[in-house]
């Protein structure tokens, strides 16, 4: 074996790709699979999904007739309709022949159901792609066999990884236009596995496909590619696993307090993680009050349990102060509360993310003020994080978040609902970023500047200690102290004086 061949073999062992016959031994996950197609411009994402819909009989008769009519004059050399038209819903998309918005479609086989998001390939629509990736379990990354990996391909793979996706299918599309060149397929597969390894992704399956002809999409392409004996795309999707929200304890972000009468008080929301049943002890955050679950109610039923994804009304065994935006959680597995967190985000607006600017942060139904300090920006070509004081639109960056009052999060790796957030510009109400929590930061306190004054957001006991000092009395014109939910006191007087 030559040195390059040996290196390739070692890499292929590091990045796991299970043959369908081995994967079939795993217990089948029958829950709906959410997937995203991504890649560079004109790699054939919409055509691939259109072909999936067509070959799984998910296209209704009126849609098929409309497709034939809209494809009039656009038929390819094979006389096939333009399957991408099944996805391109916006007039601008049809006129330009590109995808702009994120298009969601549902289809099913006799083994499983699927929700697929077709995302735009153009760089200026990277933010739309990030939206689609935020809820996906698996990414199908398309690459034009004639062109290979491009910067936008790497960008999409990186964003998908940052959004928590750990299962990738590399679809080397338009393989027919290379005369079904196996060497070309192997080269692209190896390059992507190197990229996947650098991103920490180990589960990659590479497939040579022709989306237009439908080869290796639903039906195998062995007649044209006898050298490929792996699974088709649909076989891989049927055996993929979904991300479970059971990895952390019970989470119920409170959306509404229900009081139809004086005898009933319930807390409504969608379970974001774990499970709950009557008798369980729970904690209300950020207050820290404890209660037991008395009853679980849905629209017309009293339930004996609820799990992630269920919309419920939770009744507790005692009167406690619970408001919209609070989180009800397992008492033995609580989310993290704090004034400072580390996060990664994607900038979504032309103004980008400015250093030290204060935004509204919204996570679930909780909305609070936060100061954002960019730390670094990802360079897509090298995969390195470079120092950054600000983040332009479409940039992927690491930031520090400093809150005025206690924030409640899991990390995004633990829970994609309670670990995700958006940033809103208070001046324009535009959503300027979508992000995910990576860790809690050790913090002195919530400290930020407003014009010429320093604002300290501190636990109430520490705030009282500080305001009783001579140092604070001498700096009263320059410093304002705001009380927040009680927490562990930290000695910051020396830091203020410095």
Curated annotation (Swiss-Prot):
List every stretch annotated G3: 118-121
Molecular function (GO) terms for this protein are:
ATP binding; GTP binding; GTPase activity; sulfate adenylyltransferase (ATP) activity
Domain tr-type G residues, every copy:
30-246
Name the domain of life this protein comes from. Bacteria
Enumerate the residue ranges of region (G1). Answer: 39-46
Among PROSITE patterns, the record links this protein to: G_TR_1, G_TR_2
In Pfam terms, one family for this protein is: GTP-eEF1A_C
| Pathway listed | Sulfur metabolism; hydrogen sulfide biosynthesis; sulfite from sulfate: step 1/3
Q: Where is this region: G2?
A: 97-101
What GO biological process terms are annotated to this protein in UniProt? hydrogen sulfide biosynthetic process; sulfate assimilation
Annotated EC: 2.7.7.4
Q: Which UniProt keywords apply?
A: ATP-binding, GTP-binding, Nucleotide-binding, Nucleotidyltransferase, Transferase
**G4: annotated span:** 173-176
The reaction(s) catalysed by this protein are:
sulfate + ATP + H(+) = adenosine 5'-phosphosulfate + diphosphate
Q: How does it assemble?
A: Heterodimer composed of CysD, the smaller subunit, and CysN.
Could you say which protein family the record assigns here?
Answer: Belongs to the TRAFAC class translation factor GTPase superfamily. Classic translation factor GTPase family. CysN/NodQ subfamily.
Q: What functional role does this protein have?
A: With CysD forms the ATP sulfurylase (ATPS) that catalyzes the adenylation of sulfate producing adenosine 5'-phosphosulfate (APS) and diphosphate, the first enzymatic step in sulfur assimilation pathway. APS synthesis involves the formation of a high-energy phosphoric-sulfuric acid anhydride bond driven by GTP hydrolysis by CysN coupled to ATP hydrolysis by CysD.
Q: Can you say what this protein is called?
A: Sulfate adenylyltransferase subunit 1
Protein's organism: Rhizobium meliloti (strain 1021) (Ensifer meliloti)
